[in-house]
A protein has these predicted regions:
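Alpha/beta-hydrolase-fold enzymes
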Residues: 110, 116-195
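Short beta-strand/loop motif that positions the catalytic acidic residue
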Residues: 227-229
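Conserved alpha/beta-hydrolase
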Residues: 44, 49-75
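N-terminal cap/lid segment of alpha/beta-hydrolase-fold proteins
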Residues: 1-25
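Alpha/beta-hydrolase active-site loop
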Residues: 79-99
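Catalytic active-site module of serine/aspartate enzymes centered on a nucleophile-bearing elbow/loop
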Residues: 252, 256-293
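Conserved loop-alpha-helix segment in the C-terminal half of the alpha/beta-hydrolase fold
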Residues: 231-261
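Alpha/beta-hydrolase fold nucleophile elbow
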Residues: 101-113
Length: 293
């Protein structure tokens, strides 16, 4: 079970709902901060968080601005600070967690999809906050944005565009091969809502900075980065965009960058048919980067 709290965003005063899973066997070995994706919410990570608890990690998540309990009846409204405020919230929450848990416990940032874009931005300015970063369902945002801009005029808009290459039972088959997981997403009132037309462009706005070698060079060279996705994820372009993203970090001087692709897996690798494999791999990577085997 998670416990719920909140903090006030320094960006514009928005109250950000937080969740904590802290039932570790024995003393914790580390802390994981989760930054979720667009049109979902923090409590969807309950199964993953409990698995990380079993591996010795305390887990914290949020409902980002415009999402879940943070948004209430205003889903999709990112507030006056917009997506830049969401990025600032990720950094602020990381600093709060670092202060709460102290220097003795390593703090890792796990960002999925939109949350991974925020993580990519946050580590440019605040890489000293975290002991390692995992980017799930991510992409080289500038290249992906360019591909989206070149889509045919009659192509589906919003999240529906990502389902073009998949069967169309619900319109969200691009998320997972597991029909039960897709159905749970569709049934969740805090998931899959209509994305306001200004949101997608706002997510793409940081793209030039995320591709700028001078900006990436600000990331500390000893920050471990794991990029993990399904190779059938539309954002991955068969893995090509993830390899390019990983190479950018290497070229910027980051020494420990790994790219892990799961064959045939789709966007939400934590909710895929091979989710136990993915969760085990993530837990093993985390433990390895705490100095534990």
């Amino acid at each position: 079970m998670s416990t719920t709290s909140s903090f006030q965003s320094n960006a514009d005063g928005t109250r950000i709902t937080t969740y904590t899973w802290a039932e570790t066997p024995g003393q914790p070995v580390g802390v994981v901060q989760i930054s979720h994706g667009l049109a979902e919410h923090g409590e969807r990570y309950d199964r993953f968080a409990r698995a990380l608890n079993a591996a010795g990690f305390i887990v914290h998540a949020v409902d980002h601005r415009g999402h879940g309990r943070t948004a209430g009846d205003n889903l999709g409204d990112f507030g006056s600070a917009g997506f830049s405020g969401l990025i600032a919230d990720v950094a602020q929450f990381g600093a709060l967690l670092r202060a709460q848990h102290g220097p003795q416990l390593p703090l890792f940032l796990f960002g999925h999809s939109m949350g991974s874009f925020a993580a990519q931005a946050a580590i440019i300015d605040h890489s000293s906050t975290w002991s390692g970063v995992i980017l799930s369902g991510s992409t080289a945002l500038d290249l992906f944005a360019a591909a989206m801009a070149n889509a045919p005029a009659d192509a589906p808009a919003g999240l529906a565009a990502f389902n073009a290459g998949f069967e169309h039972r619900t319109g969200y088959e691009w998320l997972s091969r597991d029909a039960a997981e897709v159905d749970a997403y569709v049934a969740d009132p805090w998931c899959g809502w209509d994305v306001p037309p200004d949101v997608i462009p706002s997510l793409f706005a940081p793209a030039p900075r995320l591709a700028d070698p001078a900006q990436l060079a600000r990331i500390r060279s000893d920050l471990p980065i794991l990029i993990a996705s399904g190779d059938a994820d539309p954002l991955a372009a068969g893995g090509v965009l993830l390899e390019q993203l990983g190479q950018r970090y290497r070229d910027a001087g980051v020494a420990d960058v790994a790219v892990k692709l799961y064959p045939a897996a789709r966007h939400e690798i934590l909710n895929e048919t091979n989710r136990d494999e993915v969760t085990g791999d993530v837990a093993a990577w985390l433990r390895a980067h705490t100095g534990l085997a």
